[in-house]
Design a protein with these regions (language model features):
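Beta-strand/loop-rich accessory regions of lumenal/periplasmic or secreted enzymes
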Residues: 1-141
Length: 141
């Protein structure tokens, strides 16, 4: 699988505390291009409020993930652990995987405004005492 199309917020990376900068729509990308070129390698590529996500190969075969209530996701050729092993963003090709690492998130904490603070505003934190549920369906194309 190489190609990705989703109905959700995009086209750029967006998180709970930055999703207002991204519009709802249908967006497409090569999975490789979902990475961000940060100076320091780090977790990246989140997209929010996706109602559906489609992955296809060059022949049109693939899968569709449907989440009517919305789901957040990232699809990269790296695990977070891979990214933590490289110092600089331009070194990410050194840990590039052939497979797609797909994260489906019920909720994710906001990322704040700077690498060294301040922390996200309270409404973008995750309440530890709250219960969170989500559902999704995966089907072949």
């Amino acid at each position: 699988l190489k190609w990705l199309t989703w109905y959700g917020r995009g086209p750029q990376e967006n998180y709970r505390d930055r999703r207002n900068s991204a519009f709802m729509g249908v967006f497409s990308s090569d999975v490789y291009d979902m990475k961000e070129d940060y100076v320091r390698a780090q977790s990246m590529g989140e997209r929010t409020d996706a109602k559906w996500i489609v992955f296809k190969d060059d022949n049109g075969k693939g899968i569709k993930i449907t989440a009517p209530e919305g789901i957040d996701f990232s699809a990269l050729h790296y695990t977070d652990k891979d990214l933590w092993t490289v110092k600089y963003g331009h070194d990410t090709d050194d840990v590039l995987r052939r497979e797609i690492v797909l994260n489906l998130d019920c909720i994710q904490r906001g990322i704040g405004n700077a690498s060294c603070g301040p922390q996200p505003r309270p409404e973008y934190e995750i309440a530890s005492e709250a219960e969170y549920t989500f559902s999704f369906r995966i089907e072949p194309l």
